[in-house]
Amino acid sequence: MSCERKGLSELRSELYFLIARFLEDGPCQQAAQVLIREVAEKELLPRRTDWTGKEHPRTYQNLVKYYRHLAPDHLLQICHRLGPLLEQEIPQSVPGVQTLLGAGRQSLLRTNKSCKHVVWKGSALAALHCGRPPESPVNYGSPPSIADTLFSRKLNGKYRLERLVPTAVYQHMKMHKRILGHLSSVYCVTFDRTGRRIFTGSDDCLVKIWATDDGRLLATLRGHAAEISDMAVNYENTMIAAGSCDKMIRVWCLRTCAPLAVLQGHSASITSLQFSPLCSGSKRYLSSTGADGTICFWLWDAGTLKINPRPAKFTERPRPGVQMICSSFSAGGMFLATGSTDHIIRVYFFGSGQPEKISELEFHTDKVDSIQFSNTSNRFVSGSRDGTARIWQFKRREWKSILLDMATRPAGQNLQGIEDKITKMKVTMVAWDRHDNTVITAVNNMTLKVWNSYTGQLIHVLMGHEDEVFVLEPHPFDPRVLFSAGHDGNVIVWDLARGVKIRSYFNMIEGQGHGAVFDCKCSPDGQHFACTDSHGHLLIFGFGSSSKYDKIADQMFFHSDYRPLIRDANNFVLDEQTQQAPHLMPPPFLVDVDGNPHPSRYQRLVPGRENCREEQLIPQMGVTSSGLNQVLSQQANQEISPLDSMIQRLQQEQDLRRSGEAVISNTSRLSRGSISSTSEVHSPPNVGLRRSGQIEGVRQMHSNAPRSEIATERDLVAWSRRVVVPELSAGVASRQEEWRTAKGEEEIKTYRSEEKRKHLTVPKENKIPTVSKNHAHEHFLDLGESKKQQTNQHNYRTRSALEETPRPSEEIENGSSSSDEGEVVAVSGGTSEEEERAWHSDGSSSDYSSDYSDWTADAGINLQPPKKVPKNKTKKAESSSDEEEESEKQKQKQIKKEKKKVNEEKDGPISPKKKKPKERKQKRLAVGELTENGLTLEEWLPSTWITDTIPRRCPFVPQMGDEVYYFRQGHEAYVEMARKNKIYSINPKKQPWHKMELREQELMKIVGIKYEVGLPTLCCLKLAFLDPDTGKLTGGSFTMKYHDMPDVIDFLVLRQQFDDAKYRRWNIGDRFRSVIDDAWWFGTIESQEPLQLEYPDSLFQCYNVCWDNGDTEKMSPWDMELIPNNAVFPEELGTSVPLTDGECRSLIYKPLDGEWGTNPRDEECERIVAGINQLMTLDIASAFVAPVDLQAYPMYCTVVAYPTDLSTIKQRLENRFYRRVSSLMWEVRYIEHNTRTFNEPGSPIVKSAKFVTDLLLHFIKDQTCYNIIPLYNSMKKKVLSDSEDEEKDADVPGTSTRKRKDHQPRRRLRNRAQSYDIQAWKKQCEELLNLIFQCEDSEPFRQPVDLLEYPDYRDIIDTPMDFATVRETLEAGNYESPMELCKDVRLIFSNSKAYTPSKRSRIYSMSLRLSAFFEEHISSVLSDYKSALRFHKRNTITKRRKKRNRSSSVSSSAASSPERKKRILKPQLKSESSTSAFSTPTRSIPPRHNAAQINGKTESSSVVRTRSNRVVVDPVVTEQPSTSSAAKTFITKANASAIPGKTILENSVKHSKALNTLSSPGQSSFSHGTRNNSAKENMEKEKPVKRKMKSSVLPKASTLSKSSAVIEQGDCKNNALVPGTIQVNGHGGQPSKLVKRGPGRKPKVEVNTNSGEIIHKKRGRKPKKLQYAKPEDLEQNNVHPIRDEVLPSSTCNFLSETNNVKEDLLQKKNRGGRKPKRKMKTQKLDADLLVPASVKVLRRSNRKKIDDPIDEEEEFEELKGSEPHMRTRNQGRRTAFYNEDDSEEEQRQLLFEDTSLTFGTSSRGRVRKLTEKAKANLIGW
């Protein structure tokens, strides 16, 4: 104990000393002096012990000197070190926090024992503290067993949720079933209020009802004509509402599935739907927001379920393009908060009995796309794309917020690796936990952040997702649990309390990659949660057994799901074939995705078929005209009525008549009087990786399906009594209603009390404005209604996130664009209602094309006219508010009074009952009314301004892509003139200058053109703002309509014309001339003044001029031209002079670079004119050659506003009418557009017009095509083959399993054994590309993007890539590895997402699915490739070891006879070759039948070997280009003469030597075509060097190598080459020849020079430097590469020879699987030589390194990039090269082919020879 006490006292003394040192060095100097004095007095400092053991006290100064190695802050350093050291042993609870004051696991005194988890006994669990169970300690261990918890609850009647249900329980949730129930992506899923039913809403326009407990498909709700954007179930569980991109809301009764209402109050897509929790008697509200910037509140009665069709409507659109995209009700329903794209949050209040807007919160700086009210209070959280979220609460008469910045990082955690990759943080989703204590935000860096909702403090960062997260779903009663899902296919269950992952699920779809999860919901009881994905699946998760789900099929569709519907005037639907409401049809049959019926055991799962007999469960099958099996009707005993038989027979006859047509009409003609002729529901293209052009059987079943049996009255009564979704029990419903009522009253009370409280003093700019409820009842239509508008919010979003536009056009609301010109919405502009309605009418040029708009949605402006006509559009949803009805009636009266005004030019909306679904038919009706009133059809003819074919300066004719200056003053004058003359109805208040700030002149770009039939014909333009400096779009636009009117000056001026005039300087008195009516008129400038004083800088009509005839007028500078010296003046003053043809040509537009492609305009026009001439000779184009005969078709001009034809286009091309090729293509498309407008869809002439248009467009785009006939033939064959393929696909009979295989591309590339072929990846990638080309999703990515159609593509995408380019590169063999191919394919997907970042677009979804599909398949290819590399590496090492082991044990007697028989290998006859860029041509030499004599002895030619393959000398010499990439040349000395009597093989070698002889110095050293006789004679004089080197590459007699040399620099100091000697083991003799250095030796150099001087080298002297040289340098130094030759064998060094080899053969043979290196590295040394890369120089110091195993990473790189290595048998003792693949016999043959083997020469010049005894001893190598 005394020792311990002594040790403690010593530590205490040292601590006092360190404290004093620390204080003395810090700011507490006085405290330090006091401490030093006190410790000295009490002798508390460390003591000194002398040699006798006595202790002596020390002073402080003495200790400082003694411990001078200690820094003053030594104590602080100790404290710094303690924490990390302890952390390694016992980790603390919060990593990264360093403190000396912590407790528990943060304490520096913690031990393993103190950190152990506490476990309570049963008595502690049963205890109560303040009437409730006590809190568990922080270090509480695993939760107690459920038995202990239940027993404690039984004793005390209380429990804590974390004890009763620990989060570990959620690990037992598993996926019960994944069901394919839709053909497209499913963005919406929700549970009913009981949790027993699941609803899914998909892009295939269907809403389906599923049973939660067993996964059965119970019902399908049909009626929508576009994608489902949002769904909501009311709190009473009696009805479901679904919003769609067709601008309608459909409401169904959940009990019977009967439709209750079709609500039409929006003019654009529905973005969110919410049933209000508000309870005010039986009065309830349904709210809806739309992309048109409006919010509607629909009043309905809870008792009768009747909905008022006239909503209370608020238009929140301060500028065009603003969309309301999300909404959320408070718990009591008294508040509704909405988010929109104008960054404003709007709050509505219901406390007064009617909805009223109370606040507009403009604190976010980007769009607010996620919003959510808390579960129990009046707080809500908003998430924005500006990277922040805000928690709002109403206090002191204003909404106050807590800022949550997504850039915040938690203390102690380093997230830089993730967050640094994201340039701008964006909130993608927000949510509350169940108790509202925390707010969860999803960020675009794939993380979730958990915040304290009261303080805004960041609590946790949850990481686990690999892509953006758009689904956050809190548990319904457990505040610790959150579900999240995203586009990465992961569904993760989180523990919010601990910030850890509980369980994750990955939605992997076999053969298709992963499916992005688009929505997720949890059932009210928390027992299940359901997810939907991008491939149409419903995923059901839950606790317990999955046995019930095993009884259902994996694919569940009803055979009637996609049958066509007919609509009445109110948009209610009937099944077209049965003429019955869908909910009254007989129970359908269950089929798979191909339309094949499921077995009878599955049919019993259909409601209504549970008790059917077996024969009634077997559907009657038929075959459609396309060969598809389909369900005809159920097999019933009742007889078919005669009327049914007749109808069925007539329908079959009609189907037979239609079957000859390629396109089936989309319109359905009905015989029922109450049903108007409407369009069939057009389903979006199927999603999923199906073959291109293939249609799912279940979707195709409606094409010719006979009518099912008509239900009897008894059936109708029975079906009307069925209950699909049960209502809530009375007790539960009343209890929930009471709770909601109480919450509502509480919210009103809180709001009223806060309203009375005084403001706190806040800065003026922070005050939140409040706006009255009458704020914005004037509403504006959106600039377009996109079919792909998929942004919708529940309290959170169910569809993908809104688009992101990082380009300058950030404000462009592309989702609302439906025109093919790529509309751009003004940032601060507007457009009138009638203009927008006209812009989107069927007669316009802006017909919808979903594919087209997907590509251009976020890319800016597209200059192309429409490609396709839409499927017949449903009627436009109109407002039905009282105020709008009043204004509508007045406007209708006004229109009736003005008989000359066109019907579609009404200022107000049209009554739903009077407006026809087709705008085209409405126009025909209007024409009929007008002709009855005395108007003639001639008045409907378009003016010459439209039909003119000659380009004119005035009037201005707009063309697509024109850059123009817009002059507001001129437009105002036009509007005033049109109103004054009552030409047509025009509302000046809705002109663009009332909607936005317009300067006197604006630079614009024409991005949309359409012509409108009427009196007069109007031109509707869409103009986008241009930046005059950059020439790029700034993001704003507006629309306008006008026509050429006499006495109205053009207010649109071409930019080129304006720029030319701007730089002219006109002075008063200057003479000018101007073009008016194709003639020159002359005048004089009198003065200059602005037209209007408010626009002093405007050039519009700023000059006062006097014409020569005396008239005065105001003129603009661009209308005036300088008078040239050679001008022709009129004979009489005041008259005009006609323009000449030359003058006309000089005044027309001069095209800019690229506007006509790569060719000049004249050349392109002549080429296209020639093509049109050829096209006009074809029969298919006969209908479009000349203008339509108006005598035969008098109504044509009343339907078609802009007539055109091939002859008109040709004439305009000849006159250079078109200013750019996009303008021409726009008009070409109008041929098809006009044909489609006037004729019935699907008619032969419409198909012909489409073919002619596509043919001509292809011809125009291909600027290398000068003959259109071959293109016509190929397109015709393609059309025929496509139709045949479709029929062939449909004709495949068989079971559902077989048909599934036939219709689906193979999902697995291979099911074979592991391949170890390094080149196998090429075949696998080729199969994968073929598979991708079969997928429909790959269609946009198969060919390069057409830059004419998407001119801004290269502005956004730096490196375009497509699958055709990838395939060509692969076939050409330009990919070195599958990693390179993988990089290019991933570039395709990244380009797609960059150009079309809108996550709701079809292109984006296709990219997601195809990317997942590719990644799944390429992973196996990459794995096989790496496995093959590893296998080859291991195999190489094994062979080396085996050869060493065998060589060490070979008997010497095996080679006792050096004269043994030599083997002559059979020549290889492989003839494939590939020529590199550096190849040198060779000349073929006929073979000579002579035998080679080597060293005086006739021998067979020895076989030259490569590193891994046998080398065969081909006796047949053919002309082959040499591949210099493989050729490395060496300077060697050889025999140059041919000796008669030698063998063919030796002759071949002889010829190769002769061909490789260099010419004279004046000639190229690489010219193999001629022989150099002088060089030959020279070399014959020299004594042959009796040494042999093996070739490092495979030689052939026909492929001759270049020469390269390795020179060893000796003692010479000059840069010239010096003579040397053959260096063998340090000895020299003959003039040096180039010798490749072998392992274990330094390089030996042989150099031929003209000098006879011989410089000897000392034994063992090492070379100083190595040099790489160019062939030219060799030639300049008179060093000639010598011919390739097989030299005699030597026991020491073998000269390595190289020959040019075919590249493909080299790739096949080389061990590394890689082409030879093509780069030659150069260094500056004394001599310029070439070092062969195929032979590696080894030294003694590194000879053992090769024998050591190489790790896999090094091996991978070596095999990919390095050349073969040469090795030696003797490991440095001798330098005889060998290859490790050589067999023992081959090595002996190579080594001992001659008895007179030499070692070169000694230092004295004597030849060193190997004796017989030594030669026999060498056999054991």
UniProtKB/Swiss-Prot annotation:
One GO biological process term: positive regulation of cell population proliferation
Biased composition (Basic and acidic residues): 751-767, 775-788, 800-810
Residue list for modification N6-acetyllysine: K1497, K1533
Residue location of crosslink Glycyl lysine isopeptide (Lys-Gly) (interchain with G-Cter in SUMO2): K421, K1470, K1644, K1670
Classification via InterPro entries: Bromo_WD_repeat, Bromodomain, Bromodomain-like_sf, Bromodomain_CS, WD40/YVTN_repeat-like_dom_sf, WD40_repeat_CS, WD40_repeat_dom_sf, WD40_rpt
Keywords of the record: Acetylation, Bromodomain, Disease variant, Intellectual disability, Isopeptide bond, Nucleus, Phosphoprotein, Repeat, Ubl conjugation, WD repeat
Residues the record lists as Phosphoserine modifications: 136, 641, 659, 674, 677, 683, 692, 879-881, 911, 1281, 1283, 1296, 1315, 1405, 1479, 1525, 1560, 1651, 1762, 1783
Phosphothreonine: residues bearing it: T1359
Subcellular location: Nucleus
Residue ranges with Low complexity bias: 665-679, 841-854, 1447-1457
Tissue specificity statement from the Swiss-Prot or TrEMBL entry: Expressed in myeloma and epidermoid carcinoma cell lines.
Start and end residues of each stretch annotated as Disordered: 658-689, 751-927, 1280-1310, 1435-1507, 1555-1597, 1623-1646, 1751-1784
WD repeats: 181-222, 224-262, 265-310, 319-360, 363-402, 422-461, 464-504, 512-551
Crosslink (Glycyl lysine isopeptide (Lys-Gly) (interchain with G-Cter in SUMO1)) position: K1470
UniProt effect for mutating Q1263E: In CHUJANS; uncertain significance
Region (Mediates interaction with IRS1) location: 924-1129
Biased composition (Polar residues): 1470-1483, 1555-1576
Function of the molecule: Probable regulator of the insulin and insulin-like growth factor signaling pathways. Stimulates cell proliferation through regulation of cyclin transcription and has an anti-apoptotic activity through AKT1 phosphorylation and activation. Plays a role in the regulation of cell morphology and cytoskeletal organization.
Quaternary structure and interacting proteins, as annotated: Interacts with IRS1 and IRS2. Interacts (via bromo domain) with acetylated lysine residues on histone H1.4, histone H3 and H4 (in vitro).
Name this protein carries in UniProt: PH-interacting protein
